Swiss-Prot record:
<dbReference type="GO" id="GO:0060271">
    <property type="term" value="P:cilium assembly"/>
</dbReference>
<feature type="coiled-coil region">
    <location>
        <begin position="769"/>
        <end position="882"/>
    </location>
</feature>
<feature type="region of interest" description="Disordered">
    <location>
        <begin position="18"/>
        <end position="50"/>
    </location>
</feature>
<dbReference type="GO" id="GO:0005814">
    <property type="term" value="C:centriole"/>
</dbReference>
<feature type="compositionally biased region" description="Basic and acidic residues">
    <location>
        <begin position="244"/>
        <end position="270"/>
    </location>
</feature>
<feature type="region of interest" description="Disordered">
    <location>
        <begin position="89"/>
        <end position="570"/>
    </location>
</feature>
<keyword id="KW-0970">Cilium biogenesis/degradation</keyword>
<dbReference type="Pfam" id="PF21007">
    <property type="entry name" value="FBF1"/>
</dbReference>
<dbReference type="GO" id="GO:0000922">
    <property type="term" value="C:spindle pole"/>
</dbReference>
<keyword id="KW-0965">Cell junction</keyword>
<keyword id="KW-0175">Coiled coil</keyword>
<feature type="compositionally biased region" description="Low complexity">
    <location>
        <begin position="458"/>
        <end position="480"/>
    </location>
</feature>
<feature type="coiled-coil region">
    <location>
        <begin position="576"/>
        <end position="727"/>
    </location>
</feature>
<feature type="compositionally biased region" description="Low complexity">
    <location>
        <begin position="511"/>
        <end position="520"/>
    </location>
</feature>
<feature type="coiled-coil region">
    <location>
        <begin position="918"/>
        <end position="1044"/>
    </location>
</feature>
<dbReference type="GO" id="GO:0043297">
    <property type="term" value="P:apical junction assembly"/>
</dbReference>
<comment type="function">
    <text>Keratin-binding protein required for epithelial cell polarization. Required for ciliogenesis.</text>
</comment>
Length: 1132
């Protein structure tokens, strides 16, 4: 919540707590004004002022700045070190005040100078911390109550009103000193206040003249001891003060003085001296006077009655008790009251009771009588004049003149009233000057707490004359509008503080020590005046006490146990003097009470209107915020739904497209596989057919070749047999041999031709096989390349599919993360809402506990005051009954005000919570909007990615189409290759046919050769026969040689014939010629056999060549078989 709203709420709570603590049924809120009227008045004015500042100071326009200031303040630790030290120091001072512990008297002199400094220090501490540490840290209510008692300057800084409008209807209800005090030190501040009062009095028309009877410093101190003056201190310590902005407070206190003169007027009307306030005030920002607005003041003719009877029933003014360092104690005021009433002084154990002669008589007289307006004339005959009391009387008269100088524009009537009062005092002093000497000595010797009113009438005639002169000077100074000159003299007298050490602790503040009494002292002295009001024994004495002259009566009653002889006489004279003034004063007070009641009703009406307007503003704000939040939520919900639908559509499209691509890929792969399978099957079939053909052809050729070899072997064997069986004895074989030679030469040429043709055909077949193998290898390479291309395309398609699936999984994961993040943010928001509700509940509980503690403190104070009141005499009971009646009315009004303030607090807390929730909701909406923008950007990027994926799929489709085209081209090439292979097959068939034809030719040739061989066999048989015949002839010839050895020529011829025949035969059949048995011709036979042997070797060599050729052909065929078997699986 904004700090300004908190400050205004704290100001209103200050008044409530003042009511709870200060306005008990027997203790008035302020000492110098009636308990009911003054407290109700002050509370009404402060409440109105706080509400005015709360509702009219442009609250809603300043909320953002205040939120920034609160954030800056909250960033620092709440428990500021300076604030904690100040709190501890103030708690020590408060304990000393409560226990009556005396402190160094030098604090009296320091209070005047250190007041503003303390104020600024605590103000800075509050500004640093942003809040008072006590309420936020959960401190107990009693500790909070102690702070305002001990440190009024620190806590008074929190009271801040920002009334910049001079025409504010509540302006006249606020004290001027509350605005002007923080900017001035004590002497200067006291001098400037009369000027402001005079100016305000001139600005406001119907301002009636106020009673200047509260002219003494004791009266001022009593007013400072009231509980209500401490209200702001207590509330500031509790953390509800207005001091978060100390700089603004200094700048606006002057305006608050101008718009709040009603409190000071009421103080003057009800017996509270404004001049004493100016003198006693440390000038550190404490506002104590309550000046009534001009329209609420009485007419000049009524002022004399008011001056004579300056206090209503039930109110009183005790002597001022100055605690060390200017901090008062409420319990001291109560003890002072009990000491005065019961005539049994009970000073605190830490304070020594001084003799009555040591205290200032003038101060005591002012403390007892000036607050009732009776002055010294009513009890001049009670005691003889004392020389030690003359000078204080003069100072009290000077204070009276200062009060007149600070009063409002109707100063002439006040001067008339003062002159009449002074004349009465002079007459009483002359009549009763001889009867006063013994009573002060008696009271001081007894060690009681004598009433200052008893010593007050002891002034001499010269003192009265001085007082009259001072009053004339005050009147002239007030009419000129300048500050009174004796303020400086009063501040000069503050340099003599040793006197309080000799006095009773309850009256330790002298009139010349204005800075020694702090606003907390003035607030603490409230209960004692109430007790003094109820002291008189008769209704007449009560009326005289209400007027302003009850302190002498109170002092007489207090001295009653100690000095019974002189007291009866003084009671009689006091009653006679008080009876005359009480009657007129009662009428004036009744009229004043009616006027205050009217004013209170007006304030209530104004408060209700302001609250109603505030409630309407809050409702309007809440409704506007709700509508805005609803619209924002609807828009974001629609946007989120639209994005969700788009995302689902994109996912569906992506899924369908991916499925289509997968189906197309599967179809293409299936078609490609089918085509490859068919092509492989066809190629395998063709290769198998070629292998079968080649195998069959090679087998047939092998069979044929083996048959030919067998035939040749048979022929060779037959030839060898024929040669071996041929005889060499026939010459007719020569022709046959020649023919055989020709035949053999022809056969050799034919064999060479067959070998050449066979070699050429085999080479052609090998070349054709090699070409087919090369073609098959090329086809296999192409098929393998196509297979690799298909595998690569398949892997690429699989990679594309995997990428698409990964992208889909990533998108789903991101969506899940976003969903979880949104749920986490929602849970955080719900937890924050629950924590805020819990904090609000704890704050309400804490406030209720604090309120209960305050109620208990109030009940304790009530019990204490009741116990004191029970000890009073029978003469006060009637006045107590009247006070109780009036107090019940005040309590009713107080309760109504409390209810109003509670409602205001609730409204403030609700508004604070709503504003905080609005700010958080706005921040959350901004965060959600940013997140939605990020989601939109992500979806846009996903859409781009999907477009790219679709583009890649299109490219892949194009690639697949290109691959299909390439496959078709390869199929065409395979078809062409199959055609070429068919052509090659046909060529091979033709070559086989040629080989068959050649083989048939060879067959025919072999048949011819067989025929020739048959013929040769026949010839060999014939030759064999001839050889046999020749052998027979040779034997015959041998026989003839034996018989005829002398005929060598015949032998030679026969040998030649035989050699010729054998030579022909050996040359034909390559057999060695037969060995000649002729002894003379053995060398010729060996040569012939050698020739035959050579021929046989030649034939064997040819047979070996044929055998080697056949083996080579067989190896070639086997290699062809192996090559065909090896190429078949490759083609497959």
């Amino acid at each position: 919540m904004a700090t300004k709203s908190k400050s205004s709420v704290r100001g209103s709570i200050d008044d409530v707590l003042d009511d709870l603590l200060g306005y008990d049924d027997e203790g008035p809120a302020k000492s110098s004004q009636p308990a009911g009227v003054s407290s109700g008045r002050a509370r009404g004015s402060s409440l109105q002022a706080s509400k005015k500042s709360f509702l009219e100071d442009d609250f809603f326009s300043k909320l953002p700045a205040e939120d920034m200031e609160a954030a800056e303040g909250s960033s620092i630790s709440d428990a500021d070190p300076q604030a904690v030290l100040q709190t501890l120091k103030e708690m020590d001072d408060m304990e000393a005040d409560l226990l009556g512990m005396s402190k160094p008297s030098s604090g009296l002199g320091k209070a005047a100078t250190k007041g503003p400094g303390k104020f600024s220090t605590s103000e800075g501490a509050v500004k640093t911390s942003g809040k008072m540490p006590a309420p936020e840290k959960g401190e107990s209510a009693p500790e909070m109550d102690k702070k305002p008692l001990s440190s009024p300057p620190t806590s008074r800084q929190y009271r801040k009103f920002n009334f910049e409008d001079v025409d504010d209807p509540l302006a006249g209800l606020l004290s001027e000193e509350e605005q002007d005090a923080p900017r001035k030190p004590s002497p200067k501040g006291s001098e400037r206040r009369p000027e402001r009062k005079t100016e305000l009095g001139k600005e406001k028309d119907p301002l009636p003249p106020q009673t200047p009877l509260h002219t003494t410093a004791p009266a001022r101190r009593r007013e400072e001891l009231t509980f209500e003056d401490d209200d702001d201190d207590m509330m500031d310590v509790l953390g509800f003060g207005d001091g978060q902005k100390g700089d603004q407070k200094h700048g606006k206190k002057a305006e608050e003085e101008e718009v709040r003169p009603a409190r000071s007027k009421l103080d003057e009307l009800l017996g509270r001296g404004s001049v004493a306030k100016i003198l006693e005030r440390p000038g550190a920002g404490e506002h104590r006077e309550f000046k009534l607005d001009k329209k609420y003041q009485k007419q000049p003719e009524k002022e004399e009655g008011w001056d004579e009877e300056d206090f209503v029933f039930g109110a009183y003014q005790p002597t001022v008790a100055t605690t060390p360092e200017g901090r008062p104690s409420r319990r001291q005021s109560v003890s002072r009251f009990s000491a005065e009433n019961s005539s049994e002084p009970k000073p605190d154990p830490h304070s020594k009771p001084p003799p009555a002669a040591s205290q200032s008589p003038a101060r005591g007289s002012r403390a007892g009588g000036d607050w009732l307006g009776l002055k010294d004339e009513d009890f001049l005959d009670s005691e003889p004049p004392s020389p030690a009391k003359t000078s204080p009387v003069v100072s009290s008269q000077q204070l009276l003149a200062k009060e007149q100088a600070t009063s409002k524009p109707n100063q002439l009537e006040e001067d008339n009233w003062l002159s009449a009062a002074l004349s009465r005092k002079k007459a009483q002093a002359q009549v009763k000057a001889q009867e006063r000497g013994a009573v002060p000595l008696e009271t001081t010797g007894k060690g009681l707490d004598p009433s200052p009113a008893v010593s007050q009438p002891a002034t001499s005639t010269g003192a009265a004359a001085q007082a009259a002169a001072l009053q004339d000077k005050a009147a002239s100074a007030d009419s000129s509008g300048h500050p009174v000159p004796w303020l400086s003299t009063v501040t000069q007298t503050s340099a003599h503080p040793p006197e309080p050490a000799k006095r009773d602790p309850l009256r330790d503040v002298s009139p010349s020590d204005p800075a020694a009494s702090s606003p907390a002292e003035q607030g603490m002295q409230g209960p004692a005046p109430l007790a003094q009001v109820t002291m008189p024994s008769t209704p007449l004495q009560a009326a005289s006490q209400l007027q302003a002259e009850s302190p002498p009566l109170g002092s007489v009653h207090e001295r009653r146990p100690g000095a019974p002889t002189g007291q009866s006489y003084e009671d009689a004279t006091g009653c006679r003097a008080a009876l005359l003034s009480a009657q007129a004063r009662v009428a004036e007070l009744e009229s004043q009470v009616r006027m205050l009641e009217l004013e209170r009703t007006q304030h209530k009406l104004l408060l209700e209107s302001l609250q109603q307007r505030h409630q309407e503003d809050l409702d309007l704000l809440e409704s506007a915020h709700r509508s805005r939040v609803k619209v924002v939520e609807e828009t974001y919900g629609q946007r989120e739904e639209r994005l969700r639908r788009e995302k689902e559509q994109l996912e569906a499209q992506l899924l369908s497209q991916s499925q289509d691509a997968e189906r197309a890929r599967a179809d293409l792969v299936a078609q490609h596989k089918q085509r490859v399978a068919t092509l492989e099957q066809q190629s395998a079939q063709e290769l198998e057919r070629l292998r079968e053909l080649q195998r069959s052809s090679v087998q047939e050729m092998l069979k044929d070749h083996e048959e030919q070899l067998q035939r040749l072997k048979r022929l060779k064997d037959q030839e060898i047999d024929a040669v071996t069986s041929a005889t060499s004895h026939t010459r007719s074989l020569n022709g046959v041999i020649e023919q055989m030679e020709r035949f053999s030469s022809d056969l050799h040429s034919l064999s060479h031709k067959v070998e050449a043709t066979h070699h050429t055909t085999s080479q052609e077949l090998a070349m054709g096989a090699r070409q087919r193998d090369e073609q098959l290898k090329v086809l296999q390479d192409r098929l393998s390349q196509q297979q690799r291309d298909m595998e690569e395309e398949r892997s690429r398609l699989q990679e594309v599919i995997a990428k698409m699936e990964a992208r889909l999984s990533e998108q789903t994961r991101l969506l899940e993360q976003e969903r979880w993040r949104v749920t986490a943010v929602q849970s955080k928001v719900e937890s924050l809402q629950r924590s805020l509700e819990e904090q609000r509940r704890l704050m309400t509980q804490q406030l209720s506990m604090e309120r209960a503690e305050l109620e208990r403190a109030k009940s304790a104070l009530l019990e204490e005051q009741k116990s004191v009141m029970q000890k009073c005499s029978e003469e006060r009971r009637k006045l107590a009954v009247e006070w109780a009646e009036f107090h019940t009315q005040q309590q009713l009004s107080k309760e109504r005000m409390e209810r109003d303030i509670d409602r205001a607090l609730q409204l403030d807390s609700q508004r604070e919570g709503t504003i905080m929730s609005l700010a958080k909701e706005q921040a959350e909406l901004k965060v959600r909007s940013r997140e939605l923008k990020v989601k939109e950007e992500q979806l846009a990027r996903d859409r781009l990615l999907l477009d790219e994926a679709w583009h890649e799929l299109r490219l892949e489709k194009e690639k697949v189409k290109g691959a299909t085209l390439r496959i078709r081209q390869q199929e065409e090439e395979i078809k062409n290759m199959s055609k070429l292979s068919a052509q090659k097959y046909e060529e091979g068939e033709r070559a086989l046919q040629d080989a068959c034809r050649i083989e048939s030719e060879h067959q025919a040739r072999l048949q011819v050769m067989q025929q020739h061989l048959e013929q040769l066999k026949q010839q060999e048989q014939h030759l064999q026969q001839e050889r046999l015949s020749m052998a027979h002839q040779r034997r015959q010839l041998e026989q003839l040689h034996k018989k005829l050895p002398n005929n060598p020529t015949l032998l030679l011829t026969t040998d030649q014939d035989l050699s010729a025949s054998t030579k022909g035969l050996s040359s034909t059949l390559s057999f060695p010629p037969p060995i000649r048995t002729l002894p003379g011709h053995r060398s010729v036979g060996t040569t012939a056999s050698m020739e035959l042997y050579a021929k046989l070797l030649v034939l064997k060599h040819r047979a070996q060549q044929d055998r080697n050729f056949l083996e080579d052909e067989q190896l070639f065929l086997e290699t062809l078989k192996k090559a065909s078997y090896n190429t078949s699986p490759l083609s497959v």
